[in-house]
Design a protein with these regions (language model features):
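Bacterial N-terminal signal peptides that target proteins for export
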Residues: 1-14
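N-terminal signal peptide c-region/cleavage motif recognized by signal peptidases
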Residues: 20-24
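Cleaved targeting-peptide boundary
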Residues: 26-34
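A short, Trp-centered hydrophobic/proline-enriched beta-strand micro-motif
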Residues: 38-57
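Extracytoplasmic
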Residues: 43-45, 59-61, 67-69, 79, ...
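An acidic-aromatic
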Residues: 63-115, 180-183
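Gly/Pro-enriched, hydrophobic low-complexity segments
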Residues: 122-124, 129-209
Length: 209
């Protein structure tokens, strides 16, 4: 299945050629970057529907659940025997079809930008042009650690969202240049999410983790 190959996207110019950016534009970019960090940090819990698409055009949906600090769950739609979940320390990919479990430190995944925005977005983020005042796009890349991949977070300005920006999608590019795009809808914030929502049934044993 193609999405097994693209999981790493979720879980793992020379100065002379650079464009000259005006001081007001730099100030606006700094404000947007700070707003994005504030918006992500303001999300205590969130649930949303998601659509995940890869470069081959394959799409699959499901429900995303997030809880700070560091917990996230991608529950795929019925018929997709996979699960992505973080318990706050490691990101786990569970493939129930082949009874396999893989784990990564969350900081080694592009998703670390979602779960630790102060460290990743604030330090490594840069504002990208969008052509719309309503859209803010932040590319997060640690150039010293290319194996961590790149994630581009896209926000829509919305007064009712935490921090005034609603996370609407992101594109993750892993170190093998595999790209995955995740689009969110029906976002709900501040909902009750128990910690056991981030446990999973280990297909290798009868033990629930």
């Amino acid at each position: 299945m193609t999405f097994r190959m693209t999981f790493g996207s979720l879980a793992s110019a020379a100065a002379s050629a650079a464009l000259v950016v005006s001081a007001p534009a730099q100030a606006d970019d700094a404000a947007d970057l700070a707003s994005a960090v504030t918006a992500l940090r303001a999300i205590t819990t969130m649930r949303a529907d998601f659509i995940q698409a890869d470069t081959r055009g394959q799409r699959v949906g499901g429900v995303l659940t997030l809880k700070r600090p560091g917990k996230i769950r991608f529950q795929y739609e019925k018929g997709v025997p996979m699960l992505i979940v973080s318990d706050g320390s490691a990101l786990t990919f569970v493939d129930y079809e082949v009874r396999q479990v893989q784990r990564w430190p969350i900081k080694n995944s592009p998703l670390g930008a979602l779960l630790d925005p102060n460290r990743d977005v604030g330090k490594y983020g840069r504002v990208m042009p969008t052509g719309s005042d309503r859209i803010v796009s932040i590319e997060v890349r640690d150039r010293a650690r290319p194996e961590y991949g790149v994630i581009t977070l896209v926000f829509t300005r919305k007064a009712s969202a935490p921090g005034g920006l609603e996370l609407s999608s992101w594109a993750a590019l892993d170190s093998q240049k595999r790209r995955t795009i995740v689009s969110l809808s029906n976002q709900q914030y501040g909902i009750d999410v128990p910690d056991n929502a981030f446990r999973y049934n280990d297909p290798r044993s009868p033990v629930r983790r």
